């Protein structure tokens, strides 16, 4: 059984979410089918958790829309994901940022910025 799981996960290809960590602000373009039309829907928010490994890995992204918190659990290997853009690298001291759920307004999205090193 373990060999079967490895075979399926190896066929999934490269992971587009390797650089995404909790605390990062990301913009994800998702393919949405409405009736016979297909369009792209952007979801921009803070990654508050990642879960699982390999083919079953998911991330939870949270944003505030019109004063209401909206969370979306996104499977990393979903074929409906068009692109992933990291807008800001956040510095989180926890693996799960569920404490952001209790915050409102600007404080709900406030995560310190992570310093990135430039290799010369």
Curated annotation (Swiss-Prot):
GO cellular component: a single term: cytosolic large ribosomal subunit
Protein species of origin: Chlorobium chlorochromatii (strain CaD3)
Record's signal peptide: none
Family: Belongs to the bacterial ribosomal protein bL19 family.
GO terms for biological process, alphabetical: translation
Protein's name in the database: Large ribosomal subunit protein bL19
Alphabetically ordered keywords of this record: Ribonucleoprotein, Ribosomal protein
InterPro entries: Ribosomal_bL19 (IPR001857), Ribosomal_bL19_CS (IPR018257), Ribosomal_bL19_sf (IPR038657), Translation_prot_SH3-like_sf (IPR008991)
Function field: This protein is located at the 30S-50S ribosomal subunit interface and may play a role in the structure and function of the aminoacyl-tRNA binding site.
Gene name per UniProt: rplS
Molecular function terms, GO-annotated: structural constituent of ribosome
